[in-house]
């Protein structure tokens, strides 16, 4: 990614020179996207649709429904997630708030990723078992690996901005001492690595599964009902379309993984990722069953699965923006 996103010294110099607390496009997209996901998922928790069934089998979270009941645990999570989303968005005005929101998001996503190891049905027996994942909850939870990278990055970037930008800095143009933004910069670096390789892992895993008949059948409704890509089935067939996607996604994963040593590959890989998630997000508007029976904006499991792509699209845009020099 670019200096505007990843190098605090360069970014700070730009802020001091312009006299504005501006943000790189990538950071704005990441914060806005993650905030939207937490706000939406948090609101859904008050409808009785949520993660409580996943928590029951978790050694870390099973005490919540046991202590508060299913509805109480769902409402507790809803309040926590809504607060997280509000704090993330509040960071546009006051960075320290999104530093707190980012930390809360990272804590939440660490717990949800841990559910992959405790929830029955994560592995898909119809595709041969692990490492083949079921769509829900396996692939649904795997996406949180990428979202976790965003949360860590936002926490670090917000902490860095909150500590490094001051009226004195903007007036004098003198950069702050390293101590003032060192912690934030280190957390940002961890988050950046997590985003890049988390996204690469998702593409690699999802791409490999596209070669199975289970996955080809599973994604068929998304493709068949899409005005953008519905022609894939008539041209390539159900398995052929899935195989093509598998090749595309694995190639995307490889290009993202080699970003540090091949910047041009990063441009191509990030652009491929952006294209992928623009298409998958369009499925929210074309796929039957995206909303729950009570209707929009309450989403079904399929809808929530697709909504997470807002965050993954944010990573892709941030990587593309950064690989192009932050212009």
Question: What does each model-found stretch correspond to?
Answer:
Residues 2-327:
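Membrane-interface extramembranous regions
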């Amino acid at each position: 990614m670019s200096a505007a996103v990843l190098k605090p010294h360069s970014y700070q110099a730009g802020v001091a020179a312009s006299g504005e607390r501006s943000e790189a496009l990538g950071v704005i997209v990441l914060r806005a996207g993650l905030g939207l996901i937490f706000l939406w998922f948090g609101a859904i928790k008050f409808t009785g649709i949520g993660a409580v069934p996943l928590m029951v089998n978790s050694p870390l979270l099973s005490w919540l429904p046991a202590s508060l009941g299913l509805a109480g645990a769902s409402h507790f999570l809803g309040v926590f997630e809504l607060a997280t989303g509000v704090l993330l968005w509040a960071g546009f005005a006051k960075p320290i708030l999104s530093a707190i929101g980012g930390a809360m998001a990272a804590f939440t996503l660490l717990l949800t990723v841990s559910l992959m190891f405790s929830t029955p049905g994560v592995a898909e027996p119809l595709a041969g078992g692990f490492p083949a994942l079921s769509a829900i909850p396996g692939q649904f939870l795997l996406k949180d690996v990428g979202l976790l990278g965003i949360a860590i990055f936002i926490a670090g970037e917000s902490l860095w901005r909150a500590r490094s930008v001051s009226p004195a800095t903007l007036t004098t143009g003198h950069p702050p001492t390293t101590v003032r933004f060192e912690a934030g910069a280190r957390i940002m670096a961890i988050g950046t690595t997590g985003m890049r390789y988390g996204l690469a892992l998702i593409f690699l895993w999802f791409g490999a599964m596209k070669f199975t008949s289970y996955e080809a059948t599973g994604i068929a409704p998304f493709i068949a009902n899409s005005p953008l890509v519905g022609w894939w089935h008539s041209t390539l067939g159900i398995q052929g379309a899935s195989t093509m996607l598998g090749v595309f996604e694995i190639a995307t994963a490889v290009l993202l993984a080699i970003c540090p040593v091949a910047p041009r590959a990063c441009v191509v890989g990030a652009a491929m990722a952006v294209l992928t998630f623009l298409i998958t997000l369009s499925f929210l508007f074309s796929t039957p069953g995206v909303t729950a029976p009570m209707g929009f904006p309450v989403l079904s499991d399929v809808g929530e699965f697709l909504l997470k792509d807002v965050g993954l699209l944010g990573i892709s845009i941030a990587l593309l923006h950064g690989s192009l020099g932050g212009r």
